[in-house]
Amino acid sequence: MWLKTAHRFIERRDDAWLRLTLPIIGLLAIASGVGIFFKGFYRDTTYYSLMAVGQDFFSFIVVVPTLAIAALMAHRSSLRALFVWLGIVIYLTYTYAIAAFDNQFNALFLVYVALFACSLYALIGGFLGLNKDGIKARFTERTPVRAISLYLGTLAVLFYLTWLREVIPAVLTGTVPQSVKDSGTPTNAVHVLDMSWILPALLITAVNLRHRRSLGYLLAGPMLSFIVFMASAVLCMVISMSRAGYPLVVPQVILFIATLAVSLGLLIWYLRSLRVAAADADESQRCA
């Protein structure tokens, strides 16, 4: 009965991808716990280290339990939880790609590599197992298609303009962007991942959702979930730096609070517009 119910929105339910949540949680608890409880662990610049510690607090306190709950509910055939789980896995893939490539080498290097690998394959497997046409059929007419597509498209364009405004002058003048100087890394991995992966994904989602294509419905939830977690992490980084004496950039704080609020609101609206089949509800209660 459970397989028949789940097949409506998943082509082939392979819990191997959800089971990767266990090693991810264990590795994440180690990586973030060491960053929090071992002062001076990071060998990076003060600026970069403070951001890393701020993100470690967020990962340890928020991401670990939320990922566990989302995985458990997704295992019990909750499509809403699966979308949130995918968003968190995108966030972790992004975060630990940066840690593995940009952090100064330390005792957790292999942990970063393992986190990146587990998150990446969980993400690929999670998406490959989904039937995008079946998912589209689960959404009602109340789905905020235009609002989400406009928001994601606008966000992508604004961040492209922000990063290019920093990168292009440096390329033309043969200098180094300020963010690269502050982090003490060869390049800014955020520039790389945003402009090559995240921002194109937001644009693809926006265009497909605007035209009510199945791919847009499939990607919108995970991308909104990713933005919620990423904006929250950035705010934790800002708090960490502020506590260490760095000046608080008020416009930046306002921007990320607004991004978090709008993304969370649209994510809730999007998830609430999902039809919950009676069979799904019955099965979830049976699993409980």
Identify the meaning behind each predicted range.
Residues 49-56, 180-201:
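A loop-to-helix transmembrane entry motif
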Residues 168-185:
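Membrane-interface interhelical connector segments
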Residues 30, 191-288:
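C-terminal transmembrane-bundle signature of multipass membrane proteins
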Residues 17-19, 75-88, 215-225:
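Membrane-interfacial loop-to-transmembrane alpha-helix junctions, especially the N-terminal start
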Residues 1-13:
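Short, Lys/Arg-rich, polar N-terminal cytosolic tail immediately upstream
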Residues 58-69, 115-129, 196-204, 258-273:
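Hydrophobic cores of alpha-helical transmembrane segments in multi-pass inner/ER membrane proteins
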Residues 69-125, 132-143:
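Membrane-interface helix-loop-helix junctions at boundaries between adjacent transmembrane segments
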Residues 20-31, 91-96, 112-131, 142-169, ...:
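Alpha-helical transmembrane segments of multi-pass integral membrane proteins
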